[in-house]
């Protein structure tokens, strides 16, 4: 029930939908089998994280109830789930992005066509848009708390287009995101929600 709500609806704040979870790419390196397929020798693993405890619990319970599921036409068996302790966040931390960080804005060009601009780390508005996104996510989770004094900035520490620019196609849309190492500075609440979701 929770999984279908997340997939179909998400959590809503100011008419914007948020999934409030994230997951890494598969950590093991696969062997390229075709243009769209990778082969993995044995097991695969990945990280899953959410700012909502019920989402994590629902995923864990679902995996144990159905230890087998379908992934791109292949049967996959769950052998182990490990719960990791959340780090103790300070107001300045270094973080390695295991899932690409995607920052974008949508606008209309002179002909009325919808355009999307994906921002690169260090580009103007990158840090500001990340902060706005984190505030909206935090407000979705903690609607009763005041977020006027919360702030967050991001600084790329070890990021290069050759190694860290990730481009994927999803539902006929090209999406750009960035992995790499970043410094997050600001309110612990926003650092936490950025880390978890």
Whereabouts are the PLM-identified features?
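RNA-interacting cores
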Residues: 1-197
């Amino acid at each position: 029930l929770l999984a279908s709500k997340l997939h179909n609806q998400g959590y809503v704040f100011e008419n914007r939908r948020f999934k409030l979870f994230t997951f890494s790419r598969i950590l093991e390196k696969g062997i390229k089998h075709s243009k769209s397929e990778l082969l993995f020798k044995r097991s695969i693993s990945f990280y899953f994280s959410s700012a909502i405890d019920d989402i994590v619990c629902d995923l864990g319970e679902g995996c144990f109830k159905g230890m087998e599921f379908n992934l791109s036409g292949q049967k996959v068996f769950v052998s182990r789930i490990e719960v990791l302790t959340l780090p103790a966040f300070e107001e300045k931390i270094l973080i390695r992005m295991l899932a690409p960080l995607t920052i974008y804005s949508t606008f209309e060009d002179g002909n009325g066509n919808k355009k999307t601009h994906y921002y690169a780390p260090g580009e103007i508005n990158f840090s500001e848009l990340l902060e706005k996104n984190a505030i909206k996510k935090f407000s979705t989770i903690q609607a009763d708390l005041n977020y006027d004094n919360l702030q967050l900035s991001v600084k790329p520490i070890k990021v290069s287009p050759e190694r860290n620019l990730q481009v994927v196609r999803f539902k006929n849309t090209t999406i750009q995101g960035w992995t790499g190492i970043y410094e997050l500075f600001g309110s612990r609440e926003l650092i936490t929600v950025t880390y978890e979701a």
